[in-house]
Amino acid sequence: DKETLEVTPGAPGYEFDVKDATAKMRRQGSEDLRIPLTITQPTVSDEDIYFQDVLGHCEPPYSNNPKRITNLELACKALDGLILQPGEEFSYNDTLGERTAEKGYQPAPAYSGTTLVDSLGGGICQVSSTLYLASVYAELTILERVNHGYPVHYIPYGMDATVNWGFTDLKMRNDSDLPVKFRAEASDGYVRIDVLGTETRDYDIQMTYSVGGRYVKTFKSKYDKATGE
């Protein structure tokens, strides 16, 4: 329903060959006859209807480090297809779980304070940062987020999100009335994350930042889609 945004669940349907049934009826001269029915399934799923629009998108490039790329791919795989129902909370650490060698995570460069060191699962902060910024554009409610102690090269200043198993996490909640879904991949030199859902807003979001000495301030602006103001 375009007014209420309610989705009527799909159900199987039935079809038959009208011309064939009409011909049989004429040949038999009777209104009682057997007609083979074909069961048809809905061509559009409930999920297709709910997740037609991109509510938030972020697509930063990554460096050509095979071990780091493996970690990016594993993190994206854990996120891809995840659905947040209205009121549901999300935890990046809970979704990925502990980053272990048994799960395929590799030692790769990661920030420890302001220093780059090889760490198991190095690189997954690029995925959490990408998800964070996409979620800001989608206007999910950010419950927990910590930036790195040093500017990172792959995301605009002040818009990153570091994670560390057992310590820092990225958490958010879907406070809208409709479900959202994450689409995530690491391929062709880019981490791509979309927050999919049903667009109901009449404005666009723009994120900017300013640097003053050692500090970065971020700003979120809203612009009317019709006027751009």
Regions found by a protein language model. Name each.
Residues 1-229:
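Well-ordered beta-sheet/strand-loop patches within structured domains
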